[in-house]
């Protein structure tokens, strides 16, 4: 029998789903065996996303994370929307680059300019006609219509 609505089988590590564990229904993003891991993973859809190791909840394996009430010290919110309150941290919207997209509290802040939005950045990128920000994880090679994350130096 599935765990919290998940269709996949549950191993001994699932520990069962009690009250307060949340549901793993269809909103879980396709619940499979990887969702039936320790109880921390039986959370709303926002938490069934990549890697969110929460020490207070145990280890969640596979491609699913275990956020929920684990606190803000861990990231792993994936593509959740900014309005999701059950993420470990607010996320940049996956729908595009708007003024709402760059939040300092995001796990991976986006670089949101008219022609650039790199969700894989660990720090905001510099994406303007002539700039090089030392605070960038990998300073961009910035030209009028280009933002290349693999650059180590800027080209003007």
UniProtKB/Swiss-Prot annotation:
Organism: Homo sapiens (Human)
Similarity comment: Belongs to the KRTAP type 5 family.
Region of interest (6 X 4 AA repeats of C-C-X-P), ranges: 35-149
Assembly and binders: Interacts with hair keratins.
Any GO CC annotation of this UniProt entry: cytosol
Name of this protein: Keratin-associated protein 5-11
Taxonomy of the source species: Eukaryota, Metazoa, Chordata, Craniata, Vertebrata
Sequence repeats: 35-38, 41-44, 47-50, 87-90, 121-124, 146-149
Function: In the hair cortex, hair keratin intermediate filaments are embedded in an interfilamentous matrix, consisting of hair keratin-associated protein (KRTAP), which are essential for the formation of a rigid and resistant hair shaft through their extensive disulfide bond cross-linking with abundant cysteine residues of hair keratins. The matrix proteins include the high-sulfur and high-glycine-tyrosine keratins.
Keyword set, alphabetical order: Keratin, Repeat
């Amino acid at each position: 029998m599935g765990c919290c609505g998940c269709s996949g089988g549950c191993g001994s590590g699932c520990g069962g789903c009690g009250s307060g564990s949340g549901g793993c229904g269809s909103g879980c993003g396709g619940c499979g065996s990887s969702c039936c891991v320790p109880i921390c993973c039986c959370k709303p859809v926002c938490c069934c996303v990549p890697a969110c190791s929460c020490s207070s909840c145990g280890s969640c394996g596979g491609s699913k994370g275990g956020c929920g009430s684990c606190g803000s010290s861990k990231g792993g919110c994936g593509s959740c929307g900014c309005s999701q309150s059950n993420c470990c941290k607010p996320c940049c919207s996956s729908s595009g680059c708007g003024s709402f997209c760059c939040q300092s509290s995001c796990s991976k802040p986006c670089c949101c300019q008219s022609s650039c939005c790199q969700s894989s950045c660990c720090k905001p990128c510099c994406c303007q006609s002539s700039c090089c920000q030392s605070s960038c994880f990998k300073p961009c090679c910035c030209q009028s219509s280009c933002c290349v994350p693999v650059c180590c130096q800027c080209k003007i």
